[in-house]
């Protein structure tokens, strides 16, 4: 587990009925990873070297579709954070392997939450969504994800009040 990755595959059919719908959702998933890279990198438990070698970034752009188009022309092959080279699945490769059940479940719950966002929000809404907004929308039943985010100090949805 010190060197293996935890790769999560998402069926393209779960992301939309048509190829065009699937491509739009995939572009928003990629956009989410680029927009919230610092938080997701911390969540991943990987080193910078490991990410660069096995799960490299595609690069930020404020237009999700442009990230996807750049990725399609990339020479990274499957060694990208969001791997789109598989015919029937999108593969998320960012996460370090684990034998801990709670870390495993937190990772699955995170990927599901990201995918749900990408399906339900349009490009403009994704562009405006902060990490705190994302965390606020996590399903309360995703207890492992919420606990893991708190452990990593990534759970930032509680408002801060100013004291006089």
Question: What are these model-derived regions, one by one?
Answer:
Residues 3-5, 87:
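A general secondary-structure signal for short beta-strands and their flanking turns/coil
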Residues 13-164:
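C-terminal accessory/tail domains of diverse enzymes
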Residues 1-3, 12:
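Active-site histidine-anchored catalytic micro-motif
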